Amino acid sequence: ETLANYVNAYDQKMFMKRENIADRGIWTAKKRYILNVWDSEGVRYEKPNLKMMGIEAVKSSTPAPCRKMLKDAFQILMTGTEDDMISFIDKSRAEFKTLPPEQISFPRSVSDVVKYKSPSDIYTKGTPIHCRGALLFNHYIKEKKLTNKYSLIKNGEKIKFCYLKKPNIIHENIISFIQDFPRELNLDKYIDYDLQFEKSFVEPLKAILDAI
């Protein structure tokens, strides 16, 4: 209104509102950013809140414990030191390795179980990794006669998958499951916790650090 009067405008047609006031921000790409927000739409915070858009920590495909770890890491990135970050990464890695398979596996939806199934080789060439894990799960659950305890993975199922260290007893680097990890397959000791942590925590964090 003041500006309209100053320039002697015929009619006031400029309307603005304040969205966020932040003292720090990191952009990795268009619509992918983190802001250290002190004021959001007129609401003032006693402590800054992180606003994240398009970042791994807010994606459902990231294991839940890592989403929290990443948010805490981003907070340190905004307000802490390099030594704080190194200490936090070491602490998070140690904590991650104590978690059960169900918590550190990647959540996904699977839609092509039938498409990639092979009667001779379990799965066909070019099968996506989470789908390959699903077909391997189905195969070994049937082989071990565990279908009374575990439902087979079907198209449209929400699943989790995790990487396995090789060599192992199924000669594969992946296994999927629906809700409970099938410990009867004796694969839990082969879970690659280092690779899981690298892909679900270190790589998303590195993408932010590289942008600084």
Report the location of each language-model feature.
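DNA-dependent DNA polymerase catalytic subunits
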Residues: 2-212
